[in-house]
Amino acid sequence: MRLHGEVSFDEDEEEVVMVPAAALSSSPLNGGAVPVTRLVVGYALTKKKVKSFLQPNLLLLARKKGINLVAIDDTRPLAEQGPFDVILHKITSKEWQQVLEDYHEEHPEVTVLDPPNAINHLNNRQSMLAEVSDLNLSSFYGEVCTPRQLVIMRDPSSIPTAVAMAGLTLPLVAKPLVVDGTSKSHELSLAYDEASLSMLDPPLVLQEFVNHGGILFKVYIIGETIQVVRRFSLPDVNTYDLLNNVGVYRFPRVSCAAASADHADLDPHISELPPRPLLEKLGKELRGRLGLRLFNIDMIRELGTKDRYYIIDINYFPGFGKMPGYEHIFTDFLLNLAQSKYKKCLSGG
């Protein structure tokens, strides 16, 4: 199978003439500044990811900045392709992960975005939020925590008893335990009453529902850059809802399918973005703990509070194409990687 999305350009477009990366080993140029070179980025993405991420505005800007995006063919040995400066990937198969790990062992000079073992940490919702719960990020700017949750591996009939023993409060949000890149793994269910809990389908994670004004903050992290957008989310649940609703209500991928809330006429107490210093501290901590540079955080603010936030999901290499100006942020990120690597080589590191 060939991974989709080979990048090509019209022959009559102006060609950018650049010094090959191999020339860097001869002598520093520009008084020690990073010399002009073409950065080769190999990508291994699904057809869906190619379409959403490698948009024309990104391809054009990358070319202008000297970034060469090359599709990786997984029917050929990876060592026979390239050479690459960076490998960008989002393929979930164990076979691909092993290929990538073997390649990186032979070519440690190639930057892999991101390491497969670090990505795997986010493929399980139990381990996903464990790092957040250990952060202890209470500060002047606010408190960051996670909803109380319970993992159910099997036997739906045992769920009501397990929930009662854990002391969780209804309603509960049910999410598949494993995140495998499919739309089904991002579906949500909302269970209103105890009797309906046995209708759920393990393995899953149950989280206490936190009223948040129906607004979700998607915090995109690309390296050290952070950008936040608002999305409409599940509506708040009140006492009337609990008394008059029974059963399980199923939802698609809410934060992805919902329209942007950035320009909606909202109560400022609900729509106000989390403080920038808090997000920067959170981003730095999670980059270090997760070992990732491309991810996003789904965050909500508890209704009626100004500074209590809950992280409800973390996603690797999310839909950056929906983020305003993503092409500038992402190409700058790639160039900064190259600059950091070059400076490290100059210093003998």
From Swiss-Prot:
Assembly behavior: Monomer.
Organism whose genome encodes this protein: Oryza sativa subsp. japonica (Rice)
Role played: Kinase that can phosphorylate various inositol polyphosphate such as Ins(3,4,5,6)P4 or Ins(1,3,4)P3 and participates in phytic acid biosynthesis in developing seeds. Phytic acid is the primary storage form of phosphorus in cereal grains and other plant seeds. May be involved in the negative regulation of osmotic stress signaling.
Signals that turn on the gene: By drought and salt stresses.
Keyword Membrane: no
UniProt-recorded name of the protein: Inositol-tetrakisphosphate 1-kinase 2
GO BP annotations listed: inositol trisphosphate metabolic process; regulation of response to osmotic stress
Cofactor: Mg(2+)
